[in-house]
C-alpha cells in the first residue's frame, strides 16, 4: 500500500504526518507540485512480461502523458533481488539530486521509496504497484529501492540522454532511514 510520511528536515525519526489514504497522499504532494496517481492495467501483466507487453497494458495512460508532457522516450526498467548490480544501482540513486526534467515513474510491480526535500520538509513516498509519481524538474530528492530490490517501472523522459542526476553534495539523504519494504520488517 502506498504511504506518505512528512518530516521536518531536522527530525528524521519523527514524522509529523503519516497517511496511506490515496486522496490525502495526492493532496499533500500536490501542494509541492508532485503528481501522484493510481493506474489500472487494461490487460493482465504476467511474470516475465516483455517491456512491450508491459507498455501495451498501459498504452492509453502512456499516450495521455506523452501528449500532455511531450515525453520523447519511454522505457521499462526491471530490477530483481538477484540482480548482480543491485548494490551499485541502489547507491547511484541514494544521494540527494535533482534533474533538469520531470522524473516520472509508474510502478507496474514491486515498490520503492522516493524521498523529496522541499523547503524545510522531507516527504517520504512509498510507491507500490499501480502508482504513478511525477517529480518536477529541479526538485531535490533521492530514491531507495531497498537492499533486495524488486520493481518493474515505466520511465518517461523528455531528454534523449535518459536519467541524468545533478547531485547537491548535502548529507541529508544519509540522515533519513533506508527503505525496507513493508512486510520485510519495519524500516522506521
Swiss-Prot record:
Residues reported to bind Fe(2+): 97, 99, 103, 141
Gene3D superfamilies to which the protein is assigned, alphabetical: Jelly Rolls (2.60.120.10)
Pathway connected to this protein: Amino-acid biosynthesis; L-methionine biosynthesis via salvage pathway; L-methionine from S-methyl-5-thio-alpha-D-ribose 1-phosphate: step 5/6
EC class name: oxidoreductase
Required co-factors: Fe(2+); Ni(2+)
Note describing how the cofactor binds: Binds 1 Fe(2+) cation per monomer. Binds 1 nickel ion per monomer.
Presence of keyword Metal-binding: yes
Domain of life from the UniProt record: Bacteria
EC number: 1.13.11.54, 1.13.11.53
Record keywords: Amino-acid biosynthesis, Dioxygenase, Iron, Metal-binding, Methionine biosynthesis, Nickel, Oxidoreductase
Residues marked Important to generate the dianion (site): 105
Binding site for Ni(2+): 97, 99, 103, 141
Keyword field contains Cytoplasm: no
Function: Catalyzes 2 different reactions between oxygen and the acireductone 1,2-dihydroxy-3-keto-5-methylthiopentene (DHK-MTPene) depending upon the metal bound in the active site. Fe-containing acireductone dioxygenase (Fe-ARD) produces formate and 2-keto-4-methylthiobutyrate (KMTB), the alpha-ketoacid precursor of methionine in the methionine recycle pathway. Ni-containing acireductone dioxygenase (Ni-ARD) produces methylthiopropionate, carbon monoxide and formate, and does not lie on the methionine recycle pathway.
Full protein name: Acireductone dioxygenase
Amino acid at each position: 500500500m502506498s504511504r506518505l510520511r512528512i518530516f521536518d528536515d531536522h527530525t528524521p525519526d519523527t514524522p509529523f504526518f503519516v497517511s496511506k489514504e490515496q486522496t490525502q497522499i495526492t493532496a499533500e504532494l500536490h501542494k509541492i507540485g508532485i503528481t501522484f496517481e493510481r493506474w489500472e492495467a487494461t490487460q493482465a501483466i504476467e511474470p516475465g512480461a516483455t517491456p512491450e507487453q508491459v507498455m501495451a497494458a498501459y498504452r492509453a495512460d502512456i499516450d495521455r502523458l506523452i501528449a500532455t508532457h511531450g515525453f520523447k522516450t519511454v522505457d521499462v526498467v526491471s530490477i530483481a533481488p538477484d540482480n548482480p548490480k543491485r548494490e551499485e544501482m541502489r547507491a547511484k540513486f541514494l544521494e540527494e539530486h535533482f534533474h533538469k526534467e520531470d522524473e516520472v515513474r509508474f510502478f507496474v510491480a514491486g515498490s520503492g521509496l522516493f524521498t523529496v526535500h522541499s523547503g524545510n520538509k522531507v516527504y517520504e513516498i512509498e510507491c507500490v504497484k499501480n502508482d504513478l509519481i511525477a517529480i518536477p524538474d529541479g526538485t531535490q530528492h533521492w530514491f531507495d529501492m531497498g537492499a533486495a530490490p524488486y520493481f518493474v517501472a515505466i520511465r518517461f523522459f523528455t531528454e534523449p540522454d535518459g536519467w541524468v542526476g545533478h547531485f547537491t553534495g548535502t548529507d541529508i539523504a544519509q540522515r533519513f532511514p533506508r527503505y525496507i519494504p513493508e512486510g520485510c520488517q519495519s524500516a522506521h
